[in-house]
Design a protein with these regions (language model features):
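Alpha-helical membrane-associated segments of multi-pass integral membrane proteins
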Residues: 99-140
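Canonical alpha-helical transmembrane segments
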Residues: 48-69
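Interfacial segments of alpha-helical transmembrane regions
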Residues: 11-16, 64-78
Length: 144
């Protein structure tokens, strides 16, 4: 098996992992009833857009579809940081509300351990990075 074949199989595997992640994440969020506020729909939207980009790159890996995948996966990863910020700021606000004597510094650790899981949105960062890795030195994107 040539190196090109191995690289192509690895790209397909990574696309599969990204697709599974982008399907399972919204499913878990539905189970957690993560649908009460408008901002809670962000992971659903970016997961859907990510799935469309993955499907395009899987079905027809062209320069255009791979660039779309790259940029979409960057947006997926960035949205994850928005989620981490929202989770942390919600926990921090709640901690300061129930402990008015706390300074912001005192509230940092309890906010990190709060009811909104700080790192849970990070799964989309992982999906985004893996999706971008698929495009790394892809033959369709390499100049001849």
């Amino acid at each position: 098996m040539s190196q090109a074949d191995v690289a192509q199989r690895l790209r397909r595997f990574l696309l599969g992992v990204v697709a599974v992640t982008l399907v399972v994440t919204p499913f878990e969020l539905i189970l957690l009833e993560h649908t009460e506020e408008t901002l809670q729909w962000i992971p659903f939207v970016v997961s859907g857009l990510g799935l469309l980009a993955v499907a395009g790159a899987w079905i027809r890996p062209s320069t255009t579809s791979l660039k779309i995948l790259r940029w979409t996966m960057a947006a997926v990863a960035l949205s994850s940081f928005v989620g981490m910020y929202l989770h942390f700021s919600g926990n921090l606000a709640f901690t300061l509300e129930i402990n008015p004597s706390y300074s912001v510094t005192d509230a940092l650790w309890p906010a990190m351990k709060g009811s909104y899981p700080l790192l849970a949105p990070g799964i989309l960062t992982l999906a985004g990075i893996l999706g971008m890795a698929v495009t790394y030195r892809h033959p369709e994107l390499e100049p001849e």
